[in-house]
């Protein structure tokens, strides 16, 4: 699959995340998601030993990958890569709930909706992007730990304006190898 010219991506600044889970709540509220279905998750990792322990936070969702493993694994073609923003979407009308996409995704993005017996995942709030608005998770993050934009703009630090000026990385501890699927996310690591 060729690189999408306007690929929308995530930016996550580990230094600004306080693990308040406002991003999770904003997403759940935007989509009225049932208990057990979380399109965005804050992962808390403890590292090190006394006297130098460290706690790290990672807010993660679907990374709308360049080479989506979920799409390749789906036996009924329920996944597509949308043309305007490069967002990976699932057609729940086609989904048979086999969970192969969840098994294939190294980032744990697709989740099973027990009520619908279908898979669910982050849509990057494409309905909001289409109106020029930020995704719900970005809108609700009080610490500006989460941002979105065109991936080239994020990589060249043109967006978000004034929020960061640190070296970017394609991975953090606890995040799967980006060489697997080409995730559309960049990080500023906690220093």
Regions found by a protein language model. Name each.
Residues 1-191:
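Non-ligating segments of multi-cofactor redox enzymes
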